[in-house]
């Protein structure tokens, strides 16, 4: 049972990391200097 929950947690972590990275890449490609709501949620600080 513990092995199953571990696998589920690992999958969730990977999905969340991938989503955050996709948001960050999209913000960078957009070329906007102002921080977006996604950047604030993920804790990414823009200069």
UniProtKB/Swiss-Prot annotation:
A lipid is attached at residue 20 (N-palmitoyl cysteine). Lysis proteins are required for both colicin release and partial cell lysis. Residues 1-19 form the signal peptide. GO terms for cellular component: cell outer membrane. InterPro entries: Lysis_col. It is a lipid-anchor. A lipid is attached at residue 20 (S-diacylglycerol cysteine). Its main location: membrane. GO terms for biological process: cytolysis. Disulfide bonds: none annotated. It comes from the Bacteria. Keywords: Cell outer membrane, Lipoprotein, Membrane, Palmitate, Plasmid, Signal. It is found in: Cell outer membrane. It holds the Pfam family Lysis_col. PROSITE patterns: PROKAR_LIPOPROTEIN. This is Lysis protein for colicin E6.
């Amino acid at each position: 049972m513990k092995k199953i929950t571990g696998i589920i947690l690992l999958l969730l972590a990977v999905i969340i990391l991938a989503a955050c990275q996709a948001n960050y890449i999209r913000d960078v490609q957009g070329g906007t200097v102002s921080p977006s709501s996604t950047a604030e949620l993920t804790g990414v600080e823009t200069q």
